[in-house]
Amino acid sequence: MNNGVRKKVTLAGLLVSIGIVYGDIGTSPLYVMKAIVNENGGIASVNREYIVGSISLILWTITLLTTVKYVLIALKATNHGEGGIFSLYALVRKKAKWLVLPALIGGAALLADGTLTPAVTVTTAIEGLKNMRFGNDIPVPNQNSVLIITIIILLFLFSIQRMGTSIIGKTFGPIMLIWFTFLGLTGAMNLSHDLSLLEALNPVLAVKILFSPANKVGVLILGAVFLATTGAEALYSDVGHVGKGNIMASWPYVFICLALNYLGQGVWILENPNYHAGNTDFNPFFEALPSQWKFFAIILATLAAIIASQALITGSFTLVSEASGLKFLPRMKIIYPSTEQGQIFIPSINKMLCAATIGIVFLFKTSEHMEAAYGLAITVTMLMTTILLFEYLSLKKVNILLRLVFLFLFGAIESMFLISSLAKFLHGGYVTVIIAAFIGAIMYIWYFGNKVRDRREAKNAYVRLDEYTSMLSNLSHDDSVPLYATNLVYMAKVKYNKFIKRDILYSILDKRPKRAHAYWFVTVNVTNEPFTAEYAINTYGTKNVINVQLYLGFKQQQKVNVYLRQIVHELIKDGTIESQPQEYTTTPGRDVGDFKFVIVNDVISPQTQLNTYEKWLVESRVWLQNLSSNPAVWFGLEYADTVVERVPLILGSQNIKSIQRTKLK
């Protein structure tokens, strides 16, 4: 990422940030007050003390969690411009090994909760159309119609992700600016009827309502209040797409508009205590609007809901990309729609998110049921982020007293939200817990499986390539061995320009000697620039053993066979390697022979000596690798002559009992 560009605050940058970052938190007014009223038994069961106290809780929750923790503190904890819990972990992981656990737990929970955000926001917006009359027609007469429209919108949203966040942000930015202005305007109109509700700005009222008889659910009200700030973690994850400067500059306007709308809804509820009493479809957000504005509000809310979903999707792409880099997840195919490295698209994750979100819509069917499940997992993520931020502040030499205040203040607040949200478990929260556990299990297996493998791998797993060049050259010129290929290419990482896995040489020399005119060992290095296409070589003083280091930009297609053919032509032309004239060819004067690419996969050897737990970890990790990735596609070799070989992976000390010779019996 070009950090210099990203730090600049521009009008265009502000617009894009509003379009990408604030969708989730910006659509909370659609359902937060509805959830708070329903928690207490409906509009007929609430009074002024309850409404004022609840709004005070909302405003101070947003102030403390979103403004102070995320905008003022967390946005400073970026890693090369990228944010999110994994980026934060990358900054502090050297401080203590155990910090990997909050990173794994928090990341898995955030990805799981992201499946609910698109479902609940879009469904809530479309429910505003239910039973609305247009002339003599009612286009959306029931909940089934709502579900159909919701699913169509979600399918459209996931289908446009390939365009990239820059294009989407430029489209969504103006819409979200209109949305927040609309929230502020309508809220101010209702608030003007009773300015005394501004007493909700007093934090004492927020504390009092937790223990007031007017609040029938006690501290469990925090489960509904927390919905107002679920988008804070997504805000942090999306900083790589728009830059922290643009977020910090645009947040005050967004916060003011949100506050005005919550206050305005509160005034309307108090003015209409018997309105729609007992109606389960009641939503104060839409009811508080003038009737002639409702259709426009529903259309605008639907667009805002789509953008809310976008914030979670782009954040999920960033999280998964970072998780792969930290070896929490297998490597996945990443597409860069723009020249900014922070803007990515991961097709496999997009498909899984789409399937999970639509599945949740079918499972819960109504926004009320979704709200009951929403927010549980994200409280876990926020708590884990607090732990990692505490370590980050320590890394930055912040005064120990201030660090402890931060840890205990936000730890206590988020623990209360977590406890209150646990009440949601049986009402649907179990769904996100199951999804989070599944994602967390994959991360755990991949990370700790790699750790076991690296720790228990034989000390001689890597050998010096330059010590085998003589043997390879002799094999190349040994006419008694049949020719396997003119150019034999191994996709194998050569470390420090000389160390290579013994498996590679085992494949060439031990299984059945593979004779070739030239042996190529290719390492692909992805650079931070978008369109780099460079290479460097080391022949170790030979004409037929070549270590090729490819340096490809993150947007550059990894068509290794195309690049290698060009490299061979250049090396033959300058005499670095020998010419490869072809006697039989359709191309006169052709001086480059055939290519055979070899990809080596590991399989656990029966000789591996590990305890049951470690063996399960490594076997599961190898299984995940074979399931999740296709190296031939990754390196652009799907149409090349490619061989995938399996070689035994022997881990741990080998205690093989020797066999004794005896006489025939």
UniProtKB/Swiss-Prot annotation:
Question: Is Metal-binding included in the keywords of this UniProt record?
Answer: no
Q: Which UniProt keywords apply?
A: Cell membrane, Ion transport, Membrane, Potassium, Potassium transport, Symport, Transmembrane, Transmembrane helix, Transport
What does it catalyze? K(+)(in) + H(+)(in) = K(+)(out) + H(+)(out)
Indicate the principal place this protein occupies in or around the cell.
membrane
Q: Where do the TM regions start and end?
A: 13-33, 55-75, 98-118, 138-158, 167-187, 195-215, 217-237, 250-270, 295-315, 344-364, 375-395, 400-420, 428-448
Annotated Gene Ontology cellular component terms? plasma membrane
Q: How does it sit in the bilayer?
A: Multi-pass membrane protein
Which InterPro entries does the annotation name?
A: K+_transporter (IPR003855), K_trans_C (IPR053952), K_trans_N (IPR053951), Kup (IPR023051)
Query: Where located?
Result: Cell membrane
What are the recorded GO MF terms, alphabetically? potassium ion transmembrane transporter activity; symporter activity
Annotated function: Transport of potassium into the cell. Likely operates as a K(+):H(+) symporter.
The UniProt family comment states: Belongs to the HAK/KUP transporter (TC 2.A.72) family.
Query: What name does this protein carry?
Result: Probable potassium transport system protein Kup 2
